[in-house]
Amino acid sequence: AKEASDWYRVNPHRLHLGIIGLELGNEVRPSDVQNIQQSLDMWNGIINSRFTLKETPYYIQTVCHPERDMIAARLSARQPAGIKFHFPYPTGGHCDDACNWEANDKHSTTLVSEDAQSAVLKRTLDATTYYVTISWEGPAKLSEKSANYFVLTPTDSIFTFTCQFTPQVSASPILTFTEVQQASSGHWKNYWTQGAVADFSQCT
């Protein structure tokens, strides 16, 4: 019975597609991050994040495409931070973060193609292969920090990028942050104005 229920309930190979975040350096401690403000604009589907690090204010907008496995972000900072793309091996567990950082020999991340504004990474682990397409606006350099760890370093104080996960190399046009933002805004506007929402705020 347990085997049958697990067939429905358990992912046989729980897979973390990757960590995307700011490359702030190992010397940064949680206490160094001050004035944290984060809010979700539910009408447009945008997360607005603000914080201060070493007296430098950061403002990040993050949005998800409604139909593709794609996120986009806009970073504003006087001292630009790198964007990290860090890929773990799955743990196979059920109640953890699915990240095994001690198994770099069991999976690989290779740079398939690159130009001045985009790059494609190929992820291979066991029998699974998927692709990570990164595109950006403005000058930036993508470098391999270590195995399964890439950093995109911009030079401008305002920087935007998109990242898409696909089972094959994507043949679709690469979208900009603005295009993803517009797609998200249109999707959520339609959701809130055309969908049905039950209001229980007056219930006692």
Positions of predicted regions on the chain:
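Acidic/polar, glycine-enriched structural segments that form the non-catalytic walls/loops
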Residues: 1-204
